Amino acid sequence: MIALIAEKPSVAKDIARIIGATGRNDGYLSGNGYMVTWAFGHLIQLAMPEAYGVANFRRESLPILPPDFQLIPRQVKAEKGYKADPGVLKQLKVIKEVFDQCDRIIVATDAGREGELIFRYIFHYLNCRKPFVRLWISSLTDKAIREGLDNLQPGERYDNLYLSAKSRSEADWLIGINATQALSVAAGQGVFSLGRVQTPTLVMICGRYLENRNFVPAKFWQLKAVTASGGINFTAQSTAKWEQQPEAIAALQRVKDAGQLVVKSVERKEACQEPPLLYDLTTLQKEANTKLNFSADKTLSIAQSLYEKKVMSYPRTGSRYIPEDVFDEMPERVALLGQYSRFAGYAAGLDGTPLNRRSVNDGKVTDHHALIITENLPGELSKDERAVYELVAGRMLEAFSGKCVKDVTTALLSGGDTDFTVKGSVMKEAGWRAVFGEPETGGDEEAASLPPLQEGEYLPLSGVDLLEKQTKPKPLHTESSLLAAMENAGRELEDAELKASLKDAGIGTPATRAAIIETLFARQYIVREKKNLVPTDKGLAVYRIVRDKKIADVEMTGMWETALAKIEAGSMDADMFRKGIEVYAAQITAELLSVQLSIANGETCSCPKCNNGRILFYPKVAKCSNVDCTLTIFRNKCDKQLSDKQIVELATKRKTGLIKGFKGKNGKAFDASLVLDEQFNIGFSFPEKKAKPKK
């Protein structure tokens, strides 16, 4: 008997159908010599500190460095603390019974780092010793599954992948647990989550936010001239930018006095734009955020759904290339899109022509190739699924299309000792840009086309204007720009060799970056304002504490990512990595514990009760910094969360302004002011009802 374990029930059922295991049982399918069971994501996790006899959030317990990590079933919240998920316990029992009855195991969890870890943790937790082989496929079509089953890989081939996943999991535990507890102990109250990748990501968001907010724009002036040649009007802008307005006005007058412009030079050239590479997950997430306003997490979820519906390849890929053998199938995929209404016309024109090979490179394919559609046309899809499918399908057509070719003309004009420049372009061959029919957006200075200007030609000056402009700050991060910053964090480093080594690793991985961003939302460190990511007071408070600490070091985080990639490649020892990460965990713990701090933002005031301390703000309360003072103000009042500003007003004036939206025990909303009485208890003051006018 052969056991087969998939990552989730839907995948297990698809594989079971193909291998003839159609008998339904509780937690598994059977038949034709197979027993097919499943996990549902991570069933096993690393045990928390209490499993090692360590008291949580105690200075003397830190750093927590377990000699050997224990594995436990996935936990869920209970009335007191956490307990094992009953559904997980039940399925683990089924998996153990299936494994016990079989001679060998086929591992059919997702073909990636997390899929490998899901199986290996179950395997080790159950103390299983059965031999196993690996089903390694890049799509869930029947054809891919059959080919994968005919070409099962030795389980040990993926030992390094497992060691890398295990090392990542343990590193995240060591850094996250120790840093979170150290900061929380130092703060004195509340729990403030930190993480190996989470914290550098927060620092990037906060740093950009503060840079944007504190930016002081500087004015400058440019000239815009209107002229014509051969009956065609066009505008040109001065190459100079004046920081002093009087200088710009003087230049304006000299141009007016000249009354004409002369063509100093004309450059004409053919510009070719290569088609974009195929999508990897991060590029798809960036594009979906920009074009569809989807979060990274939503895009990943939709891509996973399309993968499970057999219409898209494995989504968690970091490669933008396909190998030669997959490229051989692309003419059929292009022809298939001829049956898809959105792309039918373009695909028909591309069918039968030589496909562009820019995205084809065996050496640049990682565990999985770039995102492509499968041989199955989609049936019923949701609106969001169809939007993501069309991004991937359209990008495929773009990637395999010809270059976009333009004739570009750049002219330099002069008048009254001021030079002006103008650029125009004419499309010769749309190439890949014709897929979505989106024209390239040019800058302010680019015209659609220019007349045939000649060097030395004099042009009439129809008008000239003085333009007042100002410098602009870097924009706030969106999820798209943040993903790029995480992916290319190494490019902001000064050391060229380090840049090259970190380029492929970045901060986080394609599979984890969405979850990292969602964690920052869950921790209430950031919020969305339209498309922008904006830190909360809590997020900024944490940033101010950790911004110069090791845990926030982008370079260090990138180096750990590089080390994990080396473990996966078999060029670094996992035990050596573990020792290094333990030293790092001890360093950041000591660094955070040594800081004298409380989580408070700049808006605070003296304590009205003892007059010695200052009010410090925490997620659930505000309290006096004087340890002998008992003043505590809970943020939640009748289902209304008090802001720092309202608490300061209450402490300084003993009464707030009218606050709307309190909720009584009967569920009805009411408005009131809060009052701090002589005993420092908080009560309500209701607005006086206006007397009804007499009839």
Where are the regions that the model predicts?
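Metal- or metallocofactor-binding catalytic centers and their adjacent structured scaffolds
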Residues: 243-279, 285
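Amphipathic alpha-helical transducer elements in NTP-driven molecular machines
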Residues: 9-16, 33-36, 40, 59-62, ...
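Basic, low-complexity terminal or inter-domain segments flanking catalytic cores
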Residues: 2, 81, 88, 125, ...
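C-terminal or mid-to-C-terminal helical accessory/interaction module adjacent to the motor/catalytic core
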Residues: 87, 93, 100-101, 140-227, ...
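Intrinsically disordered, low-complexity regulatory segments
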Residues: 1-169, 173-175, 354, 473
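A conserved hydrophobic secondary-structure block that centers on an alpha-helix together
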Residues: 110, 291-295
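Short, hydrophobic beta-strand segments
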Residues: 278-287, 372, 464-465
